[in-house]
Amino acid sequence: MSKRPFAEPFRRALEICQPYIVAPRSHWDDLDCRPLGVAVPAALRIDPTRLASERFLTWIEQLDAQTFGPQAMAMPRWVFYDCCEWPSALFGLATRPANISAQLRETFGVGPGDRVWVPITLHVAIPTVHPGEFFEHNVGSLGEQIGVQGLGTFTKALGCRVLRARTLVGAAQWTGRALGMHLRFGPLDVLTAYTPAHSYPRTLTYRHATDVETLQRVARGDEPSSPDAAFRVKLDDDGLRRLQRRIERGDTQYSLAGRPIERRNGLFAPIAARTLTP
């Protein structure tokens, strides 16, 4: 186990990045503005109710379009405000324009010498009715712009701490790239395996812990523990519907025990099972 607080790539990122928070000023005292010891400077505590925040919020919208636009899942600007910036807090890392590509500077409308901070990652989680539980709405990263892999994972760990979240629930596509990032936080409780309520029914609803020890481990880059798989589920409609029916019986907790595995006859996910006490 590493003795250092952050993995080497994350330490390098913090040499040229600063954390930011977007939330109304009246909410700041309820947030952890030093997540895992990384202080959010006063200049990057952005109040979305102020005219002065307009340019930075435009950059966040453009960042989201860069990461989710190709999947037709980019958020309209009003969704950021209604679902993220007012009821919760948006967190991420920002860097100077000189550290990003000329193409991205053109997208953001900044010059290489501009003394501004432009966002390159973001994390959004929305509080649920259960105290301490948040629903993960968005994790976006352009970490490749500064040559850092896994910066979305680091941003998520810090963002969960900003919100003081105890547990995190979210939705992800079984074949999506983000699934590997979520598994860095440990085995994922599978709350739904096939989700007709979502635009993409082959979506799982997952849950994992976000206690300080878990977030510190992720930030160090240490591997999570993984339970043994009881069986593997084929990631097609029939396989996922069968698992969904088992979930709905309510007598067993199923968890995703690792990344899906490609076989000759399709893609399969390892599933752990734990009988629930009546």
Predicted segments, located by residue:
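Short amphipathic alpha-helix that is part of the acyltransferase structural core
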Residues: 2-86, 94, 219-236
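Conserved acetyl-CoA-binding loop-helix of GNAT-fold acetyltransferases
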Residues: 138-162, 184
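Conserved active-site alpha-helix within GNAT-family acetyltransferase domains
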Residues: 164, 174-196
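Residue-level detector of beta-propeller blades
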Residues: 119, 187-191, 253-256
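Conserved beta-strand-loop-alpha-helix junction that forms the acyl-donor binding cleft
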Residues: 169-180, 234-237
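Conserved GNAT acetyl-CoA-binding A-motif
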Residues: 133-134, 161-175
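Intrinsically disordered, low-complexity, positively biased terminal segments
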Residues: 1-32, 195-278
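A conserved beta-strand-loop-helix scaffold within acyl/acetyltransferase catalytic domains
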Residues: 44-141, 259-260
